[in-house]
Amino acid sequence: MQQKFGGRLGHALSFLRHDGGHFAQFVWSRFQHDRLTVTAGYLAYVTLLSLVPMIAVVFGMMSAFPVFQTLKQAMEQFVYHNFVPTAGEMLKEYIDGFVANATNTTAVGIGALIVVALMLISAIDKNLNYIWRSTQGRPLAQAFAMYWMILTLGPVLIGGSIAISSYIFSLRLFGAESLFGIGYLLLRSLPFLFSVLTFLLVYTVVPNCKVRLVHAFIGALVAATLFELAKRGFAIYITNFPSYQAIYGALATIPVLFVWVYLSWLVVLLGAETTACLGEYEKPVSEELA
């Protein structure tokens, strides 16, 4: 299995080195044809509407596992610091207030929160499957099971990964005396590695068709790299050109959040398009290697 994956990965990288220009043009033409800039705007809008319900549901799922109660704060700090540039603290304050209000609702309100959260996952599912030209819909029971699995297992997997990371970093290997050695490098690379893993899971689980693991891995690498570049570039812009604060005042967090969510979805969709295009562009060779 590892030999097969390594062979396919090596072939794919060799193919990209020799025909990377044509492949980039192919991806860009598909990106424009699929109007992914419009799709990113739609998903950003749906995400902002569903953000509080999704977080409320996720934290509700985590509360069912007492071991994750102590990790909630660590998860929040990790996510806001590494995935929401510059506005993390202010955004955390607002979202905590919204979630506190949402979790005090009745059973009907909680049901509505779950429905809205599922609607977000459904929108992601439909738009990503359009990129893969997958027109065959999932049966309702299968779709609901997949959505519910994401809502329930997602917090468990994230909490588990952070728990493992916390345990590793507590070892003597990552003490102060080795902070500038291998421990420091691994600590700095954790956001990138988590991004690669997240994109890899999305590009393999969400499409309602067969996706080669090597293609999903390359797409995840592309998306994770672009995500890190976008995060740093956006943080530099927000820090050095704070004119948006003079324009929007106390509401400045809203456009900042919307633009960042929009850029994030552009990255996700471009990585998905890269993964799908690898399957189309390399189809004859893939059939030979099968």
From Swiss-Prot:
<keyword id="KW-1133">Transmembrane helix</keyword>
<dbReference type="GO" id="GO:0005886">
    <property type="term" value="C:plasma membrane"/>
</dbReference>
<feature type="transmembrane region" description="Helical">
    <location>
        <begin position="104"/>
        <end position="124"/>
    </location>
</feature>
<feature type="transmembrane region" description="Helical">
    <location>
        <begin position="48"/>
        <end position="68"/>
    </location>
</feature>
<feature type="transmembrane region" description="Helical">
    <location>
        <begin position="250"/>
        <end position="270"/>
    </location>
</feature>
<dbReference type="Pfam" id="PF03631">
    <property type="entry name" value="Virul_fac_BrkB"/>
</dbReference>
<keyword id="KW-0812">Transmembrane</keyword>
<comment type="similarity">
    <text>Belongs to the UPF0761 family.</text>
</comment>
<dbReference type="InterPro" id="IPR023679">
    <property type="entry name" value="UPF0761_bac"/>
</dbReference>
<feature type="transmembrane region" description="Helical">
    <location>
        <begin position="216"/>
        <end position="236"/>
    </location>
</feature>
<keyword id="KW-0997">Cell inner membrane</keyword>
<dbReference type="InterPro" id="IPR017039">
    <property type="entry name" value="Virul_fac_BrkB"/>
</dbReference>
<protein>
    <recommendedName>
        <fullName>UPF0761 membrane protein ASA_4118</fullName>
    </recommendedName>
</protein>
<keyword id="KW-0472">Membrane</keyword>
<keyword id="KW-1003">Cell membrane</keyword>
<feature type="transmembrane region" description="Helical">
    <location>
        <begin position="182"/>
        <end position="202"/>
    </location>
</feature>
<feature type="transmembrane region" description="Helical">
    <location>
        <begin position="144"/>
        <end position="164"/>
    </location>
</feature>
